[in-house]
Amino acid sequence: MGDAACQECHQEISNTYARTAHHLTSQLPTKDSILGKFTSGQNILMTSDPDLHFRMDAKETGFYETGVFWQPPDQKTRTERIDIVTGSGDKGQTYLYWKGDQLFQLPVSYWTDLKGWITSPGYSEGVADFDRPILPRCLECHATYFESIPSEKAENYYKKTGFVLGISCERCHGPGRAHAQYERSRPDAVSSGGHSIVNPASLPRERQIEVCAQCHGGIGQPIAPAFSYVPGQPLENYVTLPHPDADARVDVHGNQVALTQRSRCYRSSQMTCTTCHEVHAPERAAATYSEKCLQCHQDRDCGEFVKLGAKIRENCIDCHMPLQDSKLIVSDLNGEQVKARIRNHWIKVYPAGQNP
């Protein structure tokens, strides 16, 4: 159905949600949605191979990445158009292109901390690889809907029409067509609230958490078609996720739910993701999250209170939810590893200097 139908009644929420990382996690390419620079001198990514560099160009027909190979005396190039932007830009962006009905990732991404272009995460630096397929599980966490085309050749075939970019209302509230039709049929009546729509806040705690866990619960193993999960249904019917106590690598990228469930805060209360997160508006300030901590905790109970005093109220999370290098989002820049730093959701006391 799309968000436009929701705006008819929920304009204020729609306006604030449009600025969130969830909503912006995939977009069509424009001069505003692509954060990388296309101006001369800022549109080149050199590599450790002196015979290879990448050039990013903005043309009337779109935005492009070109691999330039020197094989003296000839120069060879491969150019592909940026068709989809993924990533809100909080950490960075990567770019996808269509080849027929197949989706692939481009070799150059944008890294926000560096304010520049970089080799896409997981790619070998100094290699022009345009052939990494985009699988359904990737799209599930960066879009609202894509329709797969069954193929024995590969999993990255999709219909090029009807897809919905960004995480829209229906990913968390379920299909909205029946709800919208019902409300439109009674324009003078008081809103029915939850008629034919899912309000995650009204779900049992486990089902609430699973709405977030469909993307923030780790990669998991799909056991149902992509985009078939409906909020309120048991997530275990759609994807098998690692148990929060499993003795396995827990990475801060895409596994925030398991880390939260290991936390004493979670296990000794009825806390959910929305206890701390306002999902309909952008929130980034440490003090904002610290206010949530102080709804349950007293500042004087913190071991650092004697040293810092009331100032400690401004930032609980840097000590108790420290930023951690991701093991999965790693790029290579001229032989140096560049890792995304993401907030660890295992809430606890970390001894000074301990690497979480």
What feature does the model see in each segment?
Residues A4, E12-T86, T94-L96, I118-S124, ...:
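Primarily the internal scaffold of c-type cytochrome electron-transfer domains
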Residues T94-Q102, L106-E140, T144-N156:
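Propeptide (latency) domains of metzincin metalloproteases
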